[in-house]
């Protein structure tokens, strides 16, 4: 059986392209993950897919970084599939799916390619994080870094959350207890404390 696995790192990303790609390569069953886990253990759908595959199956992913967040995780997943005698197919790397000729050389080359790709993938991820941190630092120095938009604020996208924000400010100004406010408007005490701090309310 041909099993596909697709993952996007956030709910905002489009999953359709990956799904179409996997179907093009004959995936009969596709597992999809719409969350970003910091480790394989935090990717329940990947775990489910790996548990599902059986000896003789083919496991398809679009790129090697779908198999793990770093070099060790990728190699661990690859070895897990090997132990189960499941063929791994990476659609973005056609040569991985071609037989070189000599079985021993074939195995050696593919193992080597996977190790190199896993290492490069981890380096690219680290470099991306470094550039992001550098960009944030520059933005902070220029006074233009805004950070993530606040869920409850006077400028919140959701009008209902703007109403809640103003209600919290009103209750704080009335001197009501943090726990009472949090319970009444159904938000966390940490959020109430943050709104209190942002408004300079003692």
Swiss-Prot record:
Cited Gene3D superfamilies: Homeodomain-like (1.10.10.60), Resolvase, N-terminal catalytic domain (3.40.50.1390)
PROSITE patterns listed in its UniProt record: RECOMBINASES_1, RECOMBINASES_2, RECOMBINASES_3
GO biological process terms, semicolon-separated: DNA integration; transposition
Domain Resolvase/invertase-type recombinase catalytic: start-end pairs: 1-143
Pfam families: HTH_7, Resolvase
Active site as annotated: 9 (o-(5'-phospho-dna)-serine intermediate)
InterPro entries from the UniProt entry: Recombinase_CS (IPR006118), Resolv_N (IPR006119), Resolvase-like_N_sf (IPR036162), Resolvase_HTH_dom (IPR006120), SSR_resolvase (IPR050639)
Keyword list, A-Z: DNA integration, DNA invertase, DNA recombination, DNA-binding, Plasmid, Transposable element, Transposition
CDD domains (UniProt xref): SR_ResInv
GO molecular function: DNA binding; DNA strand exchange activity
Similarity annotation: Belongs to the site-specific recombinase resolvase family.
Function (record text): Potential DNA invertase.
Protein name: Putative transposon Tn552 DNA-invertase bin3
């Amino acid at each position: 059986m041909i099993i596909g696995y697709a993952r996007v790192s956030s709910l905002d990303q489009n999953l359709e392209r990956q799904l179409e790609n996997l179907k093009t390569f004959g995936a009969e069953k596709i597992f999809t993950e719409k969350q970003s886990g910091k480790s394989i253990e935090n990717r329940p759908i990947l775990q489910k897919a790996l548990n599902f595959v059986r000896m003789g199956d083919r496991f398809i992913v679009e790129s090697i970084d779908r198999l793990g967040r770093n070099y060790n995780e990728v190699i661990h997943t690859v070895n897990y599939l090997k132990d189960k005698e499941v063929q791994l197919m990476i659609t973005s790397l056609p040569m991985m799916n071609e037989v070189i000729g000599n079985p021993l050389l074939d195995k050696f080359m593919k193992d080597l390619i996977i190790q190199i790709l896993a290492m490069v993938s981890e380096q690219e991820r680290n470099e991306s994080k470094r550039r992001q941190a550098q960009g944030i630092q520059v933005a902070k120095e220029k006074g233009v870094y805004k950070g993530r938009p606040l869920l409850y604020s006077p400028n919140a996208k959701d009008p209902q959350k703007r109403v809640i924000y103003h209600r919290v400010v009103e209750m704080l100004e009335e001197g009501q207890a943090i726990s009472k406010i949090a319970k009444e408007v159904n938000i966390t005490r940490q959020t109430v404390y943050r709104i209190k701090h942002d408004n300079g309310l003692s």
